[in-house]
Amino acid sequence: MTRKVQVAAMVAGIIMGISSPAIRAQGLGGLGDMAGNAHQFKPYRRVHLGPKYQDTIIEAMVYECPFCRALNNQTLRWAATLPSSIHFEQMPAAVGKPWISMAQSYFAVAAIDPGILPRFDSESFHLVQDDQDSYSDPRTYALAAEKIGVRPADYLAAMRYKPIQQLVLQDIRIMGKAGIRQTPSLIICGRYVITPGSVQGNYSLYFQLANALASHCISENHLEDKTP
C-alpha cells in the first residue's frame, strides 16, 4: 500500500469512526486508539490550548509561504461553509521576532475593516513572493495597506492601538502552545493541528480531515449547530 493510499484510508477511517457510537463513547482517545491499532501514523497532532478555543478553528499562515498563498482563497471559502457553532480565525504565525510586524499589521488592518483582509492578504503575498519585499520589514505591510486604500494615518493609529499589541501577544502564545512550525496549519478546537503535509499535500483530503475533526469537536463539546 502506498503512502498516499495509507493516508486516504486513515482519513476515511477517521471520518467513519467519528460517526461510530463506539468511537464516540471512547471520546478523544478513540481517534488515537484507532490510529494506533492500525499501526499507522496519525494525520494530526494533539495539542491543548484549553476550553477557550473549543469552538474555534485557527489557520496559521505567513506571507512568505507559497502553500499559504495557493490555499488562501480555498481556505476562506471552506471556512464560510463551517457550522455557525464553529468560529474561524486566520492569523499570521508569529513564531519569532521576524513575524511580529506581520502579525501586528494583520491585526491593525482587521481593526480598521475586517472586510478588506482578503485584499490585504493578496497584496502582502504579492509583495513578499513576487516583488521579493522582506516579510519581516514593517514597510512591506504599510505599503500593502496603502495599496488597498487604507489611509496611512489610520494604519499608523491602528498599529499603535494597545489592543492590537495584546492580539499580537495572544498570537505568540497560541503559536507557541500549538507548536506551530509549518504553514499553513489548522488548529482545530484547540485540540488538533493539521497541515497539508499531514495528508501528503492532498488538499481535498486536508479539508476532509479538517471537517471530520471539527465534527468530532462539535459532538464532544455538545456545540449546537445554529445553521438554519
Report each predicted region and the residues it spans:
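C-terminal cap of thioredoxin/glutaredoxin-like
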Residues: 147-228
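Sec-exported extracytoplasmic/periplasmic mature domains
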Residues: 70, 76, 80-84, 107-114, ...
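Extracytoplasmic thiol/disulfide redox context detector
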Residues: 9-100, 172, 176-179, 214-228
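Structural microenvironment flanking redox-active thiols in thiol-disulfide oxidoreductases
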Residues: 83-107, 117, 121-146
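Second-shell loop/turn segments in exported
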Residues: 61-64, 91-95, 107, 111, ...
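Solvent-exposed, acidic/flexible segments
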Residues: 54, 64-71, 95-102, 114-117, ...
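Bacterial N-terminal signal peptides that target proteins for export
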Residues: 1-10
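Extracytoplasmic/secreted envelope proteins and their assembly/folding machinery
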Residues: 72-79, 102-106, 117, 121, ...
